[in-house]
Amino acid sequence: MSNDILLQLDKILDARKTESPETSYVASLYEKGLDKILKKVGEEATETVMAAKDAEYTQNNDNLVYEVADLWFHTLILLSHQGLSSTDITNELQKRFGLSGHEEKANRSKNDA
């Protein structure tokens, strides 16, 4: 997967911070603050779960892909609001690459102690 689209979205989301909430959906979320953004992420996560269940039943993944894209988009808005970007996440994933889930979890537990 190319990281280019994520980097492009990072730039757009950052630019929306200075745009009018009346003309930009993203700017309106930024203006409403963290709680509104978290609510949207939660809504999109729920819709993703429901789409996955539907996809299993219908054997059609189109809506699942659509909902995951919405979830990713709103998660990127959250990251941007918090001063982070997709690069922060891809860097974290890169650190975990090659580790089993059990190893990653054990390392996390040691760091939390």
Curated annotation (Swiss-Prot):
Q: What is its EC number?
A: 3.6.1.31
Its recorded reaction(s) are: 1-(5-phospho-beta-D-ribosyl)-ATP + H2O = 1-(5-phospho-beta-D-ribosyl)-5'-AMP + diphosphate + H(+)
InterPro entries linked: HisE, PRib-ATP_PPHydrolase-like
- Pathways per UniProt: Amino-acid biosynthesis; L-histidine biosynthesis; L-histidine from 5-phospho-alpha-D-ribose 1-diphosphate: step 2/9
Report any Pfam family annotated for this entry.
PRA-PH
CC terms in the record's Gene Ontology section: cytoplasm
Alphabetical list of Gene3D superfamilies matching this protein: MazG-like (1.10.287.1080)
Under SUPFAM superfamilies, the record lists: all-alpha NTP pyrophosphatases
Question: Per UniProt, what is one GO molecular function of this protein?
Answer: ATP binding
- Give the location in the cell: Cytoplasm
Q: Has the keyword Hydrolase been applied to this entry?
A: yes
Q: Quick one: a GO biological-process term for this protein?
A: L-histidine biosynthetic process
Q: Which UniProt keywords apply?
A: Amino-acid biosynthesis, ATP-binding, Cytoplasm, Histidine biosynthesis, Hydrolase, Nucleotide-binding
Q: Which HAMAP family match?
A: HisE (MF_01020)
Q: Can you tell me which family this protein belongs to? A: Belongs to the PRA-PH family.
**Record's PANTHER family?**
HISTIDINE BIOSYNTHESIS BIFUNCTIONAL PROTEIN, HISTIDINE BIOSYNTHESIS BIFUNCTIONAL PROTEIN HISIE
Q: What is this protein called?
A: Phosphoribosyl-ATP pyrophosphatase
Write the lineage as a comma-separated list.
Answer: Bacteria, Pseudomonadati, Pseudomonadota, Gammaproteobacteria, Thiotrichales
